[in-house]
Swiss-Prot record:
Belongs to the class-I aminoacyl-tRNA synthetase family. It catalyses: tRNA(Arg) + L-arginine + ATP = L-arginyl-tRNA(Arg) + AMP + diphosphate. Gene3D superfamilies: HUPs, Isoleucyl-tRNA Synthetase, Domain 1. One of its GO terms (biological process) is arginyl-tRNA aminoacylation. A motif ('HIGH' region) lies at residues 120-130. The lineage of its organism: Archaea, Thermoproteota, Thermoprotei, Thermoproteales, Thermoproteaceae. GO terms for cellular component: cytoplasm. It comes from the Archaea. Pfam families: DALR_1, tRNA-synt_1d. It comes from Pyrobaculum aerophilum (strain ATCC 51768 / DSM 7523 / JCM 9630 / CIP 104966 / NBRC 100827 / IM2). This is Arginine--tRNA ligase. PANTHER family: ARGININE--TRNA LIGASE, CYTOPLASMIC, ARGINYL-TRNA SYNTHETASE. It is found in: Cytoplasm. GO terms for molecular function: arginine-tRNA ligase activity; ATP binding. Its EC number is 6.1.1.19.
């Protein structure tokens, strides 16, 4: 139920009458700008004379309307204000009938969706950047589910490639030590250190070989600086995992790790049982830790898709390379044994920029290594094709803007292979990075802030903050406040804008934070607990300004949900909830509810109930935990 449906229909009738009088070929669209009225319509494109528009509106403005309170003309805008008392009746009726589903409308239902998100490499813990991905993907899924759509969430387990092989090789060298260590620590944390150390040892070995061949003194000094940097990485890792890191350096230091990793990857991709056992053991350990972190955030994954199973062992990735070579030999080049597809020329020749929503610059794409093994993008094409064939209307892939070209290549190659409908199903839901002031991150060097560390600090800071108001706050409440604050911080900004993560903003009790919203919810909940049953609600003709604003704000909720779902923008929900909470808290400070006069007490309790209902629905969409005390 949408409380604004009937008022909007009444305004559309007015627009129809005005348009007929003016002899217009169509009725202007209704806009909700609230600039000069709650509803507006622009007559600019029809070249209407302003005085004639005003004259026509004057003829009908004094009619009796059920939901419109006034009509006015400003330039070539026709504006309408609403009868807020009538709207309040519609709002309360919708809230009582729909409860926590208030906000859902039939227009909100748009189809079925496969949402792939997080998909972190299984070599280290989820870090703060993965946090934004996971929370965005989870909230998109929640938003689409709230709207009645069929939604399935997927995590792509990238278990192929040299980096995963480094983790497996390092783990194999110190397996006994790692097993003891993970009895007390999360497995993804320990494997993350093992991976970074193995990578550092491999880089030191590679650079030493390069140093032997270097002839230029400047290049030699540059290589020595790089070696020193990687040695520093090992020393830093020893502070947390001394015995394990020392053994990795000792066991692997004299081996050609890069070539060994390439060979192990080749064996793994060919399905060698021994290689599968080594790699899967370490991958599953990391996934166990990543699952724990996601559960802590309230993120649920429906299906875990292993890259090896869906794209490599099925031979699907190699089939794609072979088919592309047969179909489009004129766009294929062989460079050093590697297969390259000239995606740039293909897009230009077939003018595909608008068809596939592509960036203007498209580089060529390498499909295989010189040894014939497939690369990430090739396997990703195979995975995208598999996703597109799962019976969903759209496939939403939550992947950072850093992969804009790779994701464009996926759609281009699908199109080139004749999978046109499948290519058009794929949506690259791009998002920008999360910046921590003073912190430069590199997973290969073991330099990152894990998502668990962020959540730990959020809980700790939340406990200190909330205990100032309520000394009896438990650790469970502090954890839920921390989770809410982190989720909101990652959702309140447009996905296309980078986030500067600052604790004073994340835990602001006065505005624009998950903590602020949770505090507002607790306030509304507390009032309703004391109020008891909500009986008949007579709506007063005269309301406080904040009451009028709250009624109209609550009435807008279904429209906000519909627009957020249509645009795939959970930040619209976050922005709306912050605005609602600001108005409600201002109202709370000015107007007594429980001790109000009997003539308005029921009305005010109904407003509080409506605010609480909207917050509950919004919290579900954003994944913010609800609290009854704080």
């Amino acid at each position: 139920m949408d409380p604004l449906r009937q008022p909007r229909e009444e305004f559309v009738k007015v627009l129809g009458e005005v348009s007929r009088e003016l002899g217009l070929p169509e009725v202007p669209e209704v806009e909700r700008t609230r600039r000069y009225g709650f509803f507006s319509a622009r007559f600019h494109k029809y070249k209407v004379d302003h005085s004639r528009l005003a004259e026509v509106v004057n003829l009908i403005k004094n009619k009796r309307f059920e939901f419109l309170s006034s009509l006015s003309v400003d330039g070539l805008y026709l504006n309408a204000d609403l009868n807020v008392s009538k709207v309040a009746e519609l709002v309360f009726e919708a809230v009582v009938k729909m409860g926590r589903k208030y906000g859902f409308t039939e227009e909100c239902v748009t189809g079925s969706y496969l949402v792939e998100h997080t998909s972190a490499n299984p070599v280290h813990p989820l870090h703060i950047g993965h946090g934004r991905n996971a929370i965005l993907g989870d909230s998109l899924a929640r938003l689409l589910k709230f709207c009645g759509n069929k939604v399935e969430t997927h995590f792509y387990v990238d278990d192929c490639g040299v980096q995963v092989m480094y983790a497996a090789m390092g783990y194999n060298a110190v397996k006994d030590e790692v097993k003891k260590r993970i009895e007390k620590s999360k497995p993804d944390v320990v494997i993350g250190h093992v991976y970074s150390a193995t990578n550092a040892v491999a880089e030191i070995g590679r650079l030493k070989k390069e140093l032997e061949k270097a002839q230029d003194d400047e290049r030699k000094r540059e290589i020595l600086r790089e070696i020193d940097e990687w040695v520093a990485v090992l020393k830093r890792l020893m502070d947390s995992e001394g015995d394990i890191i020392s053994k990795i350096a000792e066991e692997l230091g004299r081996r050609d790790l890069l070539n060994e990793a390439v060979e192990l990857n080749r064996r793994y991709e060919s399905g060698d049982p021994e290689a599968k056992g080594v790699v899967r053991e370490v991958v599953d350990l990391v996934l166990k830790g990543q699952r724990e972190t996601l559960a802590r955030l309230g993120v649920e994954i429906d299906k875990w898709d292993y890259e090896s199973e869906l794209t490599v062992w099925s031979s699907e990735a190699m089939r794609i390379v072979s088919e592309l070579q047969k179909r489009w030999p004129q766009y294929i080049e062989i460079k050093g044994g590697a297969v390259v597809f000239r995606a740039d020329k293909f897009v230009q020749d077939y003018n595909l920029w608008d068809v596939l929503d592509l960036p203007r610059f498209i580089p060529p794409v390498t499909l295989t290594r010189s040894d014939g093994t497939t690369l990430y993008v090739t396997r990703d094409v195979a995975y995208a094709l598999w996703q597109a064939r799962q019976g969903f209307d759209k496939v939403i892939r939550v992947i950072s803007t850093e992969q804009t070209h790779e994701q464009a290549h996926v759609r281009i190659i699908l199109y080139a292979l004749g999978y046109v409908d499948e290519a058009k199903k794929i949506v690259h839901y791009a998002y920008e990075m999360v910046n921590l002031p003073g912190m430069k991150m590199s997973a290969r060097r073991g330099q990152y802030i894990s998502l668990d560390e962020i959540l730990d600090e959020a809980a700790e800071r939340s406990a200190s903050l909330v205990k100032e108001k309520n000394p009896e706050v438990s650790g469970v409440i502090a954890e839920r406040v921390g989770v809410g604050s982190v989720r909101y911080a990652f959702l309140t900004t447009s996905p296309r804008k980078p986030i500067e993560f600052k604790w004073d903003v994340v835990l602001n009790l006065r505005q624009n934070s998950g903590t602020f919203l949770q505090y507002t919810y607790v306030r509304a909940y507390s009032i309703l607990e004391k109020a008891g049953e909500i009986g008949n609600v007579p709506v007063p003709e005269n309301m406080l300004a904040e009451e009028r604003e709250l009624v109209l704000k609550i009435a807008e909720w279904p429209s906000v949900v519909k627009e957020a779902a249509k645009s795939l923008r959970p930040d619209y929900v976050a922005e709306y909830l912050d605005g609602l909470a600001l108005v409600f808290n201002s109202y709370y400070e000015k107007a007594p509810v429980l001790k109000a006069e009997e003539s308005v007490r029921g009305f005010r309790i109904a407003i509080v109930n409506a605010v609480k209902t909207v917050l509950e629905a919004g919290f579900y969409i954003l994944g913010i935990p609800t609290l009854t005390k704080m």
